[in-house]
UniProtKB/Swiss-Prot annotation:
UniProt protein name: Imidazole glycerol phosphate synthase subunit HisF
One annotated GO molecular function: imidazoleglycerol-phosphate synthase activity
Function: IGPS catalyzes the conversion of PRFAR and glutamine to IGP, AICAR and glutamate. The HisF subunit catalyzes the cyclization activity that produces IGP and AICAR from PRFAR using the ammonia provided by the HisH subunit.
Residues annotated as catalytic: D11, D130
NCBIfam families: hisF
Disulfide bonds: none
Underlying gene: hisF
Root EC class: lyase
Catalytic activity entry: 5-[(5-phospho-1-deoxy-D-ribulos-1-ylimino)methylamino]-1-(5-phospho-beta-D-ribosyl)imidazole-4-carboxamide + L-glutamine = D-erythro-1-(imidazol-4-yl)glycerol 3-phosphate + 5-amino-1-(5-phospho-beta-D-ribosyl)imidazole-4-carboxamide + L-glutamate + H(+)
Organism: Delftia acidovorans (strain DSM 14801 / SPH-1)
Family, as annotated: Belongs to the HisA/HisF family.
Length: 266
């Protein structure tokens, strides 16, 4: 069994790392370069850097900050937020990223995943999915087949601001078919709440795709990380709040996962 990965996440806006609850109420967590260096030293398996307002603000990639972060870490670095084109992938890889993450752009133009994967390989193309459990009203929504959507999760774009009406599990499967090498799956309902992953969502997507799934959104304890793997079927677990504010270190997280029988790199 392959080692399961622990991935701290840097949500960046205005050149600072922030953390919110349910994608709002953002709170400052510090300088991205300093925080990245800290996680590298703590033994994180990978690092994810998301420019969370690039798409909604219509901004370009913040390459200087990405270059500075990349210079501090010697573990795989995934960069997302405002990634729109195959050319953006090239620019990010040149800036020091190892993987690039598409979200809203893949929804607007799914072909970009085929093109980016064909050119650079599936191993460096991640598709991020921001999923939210359907409300009772959303469940009644009629699909193209004339049937009500029913229970499940919808995909949101533009930093969680816009409901696309796409089914999260079906969308993940389509992205994997088109060449995504990994799915970064965030539960918007759980984001920042510290109430644990949405394990039903994680399991549904993990079972539906042949590529690794990174569970994100809701970690409040070290056992939540282990649950993402053992109950959710995730290949990697991503967390922000519990690491940023010093509640736990990556080393403590790995120790707890190992105690729970999850294979990790210690």
């Amino acid at each position: 069994m392959l080692a399961k990965r622990i991935i701290p996440c840097l949500d960046v806006t205005g050149g600072r790392v922030v953390k919110g609850v349910n994608f709002v109420e953002l709170r400052d967590a510090g300088d991205p370069v300093e925080i990245a260096a800290r996680y590298n030293a703590q033994g994180a398996d990978e690092l994810t850097f998301l420019d969370i307002t690039a798409t909604s603000d219509g901004r370009d990639l913040i390459l200087p900050i990405i270059e500075s972060v990349a210079s501090q870490v010697f573990i795989p670095l995934t960069v997302g937020g405002g990634v729109r084109t195959v050319e953006d992938v090239r620019r990010l890889l040149n800036a020091g990223a190892d993987k690039t993450s598409f979200n809203s752009a893949a929804i607007a133009n799914p072909e970009v995943i085929n093109a980016a994967s064909d050119k650079y390989g599936a191993q460096c193309i991640v598709v991020a999915i921001d999923a939210k459990r359907r409300t009772a009203e959303d469940e009644q929504r009629m699909g193209a087949d004339g049937r009500a959507a029913g229970p499940g999760w919808d995909v949101y774009s533009h930093g969680g601001r816009k409901n696309t009406g796409l089914d999260a599990v079906q969308w993940a499967a389509e992205m994997a078919r088109r060449g995504a090498g990994e799915i970064l799956l965030t539960s918007m309902d759980r984001d920042g709440t510290k109430s644990g992953f949405d394990l039903k969502l994680t399991r549904a997507v993990s079972d539906a795709v042949p590529v690794p799934v990174i569970a994100s959104g809701g970690v409040g304890s070290l056992d939540d990380l282990a649950d993402g793997v053992t109950l959710g079927g995730a290949d990697a677990v991503l967390a922000a709040s519990i690491f940023h504010y010093g509640e736990f270190t990556v080393g403590q997280a790995k120790q707890r996962m190992a105690e729970r029988g999850v294979p990790v790199r210690l």
